[in-house]
Amino acid sequence: MSIGREEEVEIHNPPRFMPGERVCATRHIKNDGTYPGKEIGERLVRKGDAGFVRDVGTFLQQFYIYAVEWIDRGIVVGMRTRELRSLGGTSTPKTTECARGVNEGKAR
C-alpha cells in the first residue's frame, strides 16, 4: 500500500518565480506564528499587494517558498507558489493591475 501525497512535489520542476521578479498576492496571508513581532492571525499581506521575489528556498523537500519583499508594507514574507502570480515586466504596481486575475480560476 502506498501513501499518496496531497499535492505534487514542486521541486521536481524549476521555480515558477525568480529573484527580482514582480509578483502579486492572490490571497490574504495571516501570521501563522512564524513571523516574529506580529500577533498570530494578524494580516501580513493583502490580496492584490505587489512585491518582489528576493530569494527562493524549499520546504519539506516538496514546495518552493519565495521570500517576497512587500515594499508598501516594509516586510519580507515567505509565500507558496499558489499564493502568487507574476506581474511580469510592469514598471509600477497598481491596485487594479494586481487585482486583475486574482479571482479568475485557480492561483498559479
UniProtKB/Swiss-Prot annotation:
The entry's keywords: Nitrogen fixation, Plasmid
Coiled-coil stretches: none
Secretion signal span: none
Disordered: region residues: 86-108
Pfam family, one: NifZ
Organism superkingdom: Bacteria
GO biological process: nitrogen fixation
InterPro entries: Nitrogenase_MoFe_mat_NifZ
Family recorded in the similarity comment: Belongs to the NifZ family.
Protein name: Putative NifZ protein
